[in-house]
């Protein structure tokens, strides 16, 4: 309540909130430009550390699809730095390449990812006749993963309704961890999760329950959703589907699509000034980082 009044007074009286010196923002892609403009106005004397992955903005209503506008607003000074962390330590090469090919089906800019050289099993895509066969396949795959010693396994569903249906179907044959992902009660075992609850998490193995063209049409919003689902897997990834497989997987990626990179990638190549001149060291931190 007190902070809300501070922000209100700042906007109303054209003053600056002075009780914060540095702001750290994680999952930065989930906030829209209006939120950043408000922060910049209310906390104009702060320094910022902003981290995120625009490929993981799975909302079609808000958030960022590229860093370009944010850079213009939040990083205008000569001492501001924009960096792209290209190295991925999470996924195997096979999973990373599979997920990156999904991204290329979108119309938005793509930032390059370089997986560490850690190879694993190829990504498996299996067609099922109906829901019953999907459940049978899921049971077999989960038990095979458990026999390999994979401790954390996620069955990723498109939404809550499908997750509830799959949970009910698997409970008789697979021991499930029924912790509430929305409340961050994540532990070892097998979890059946709606896709939106998996963002920010990782599992030894992931089973995408139904990657059909109906659940994941070739549209930007679904590109990012399927990308997020695939990149939750550390070691093994299997994709099931019934009907027709989504074009995000089956459609080939053209050379032109693979050349589509964000303009922000080029911006990173520009030299960044990191040394403060002697005359500037006599200024206060507030003046230097204004």
Name each model feature, range by range:
Residues 2-7:
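Short, small-residue-biased leader/transition segments that mark boundaries at the very start
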Residues 12-22, 29-290:
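Conserved helicase motor core of SF1/SF2 NTP-dependent helicases
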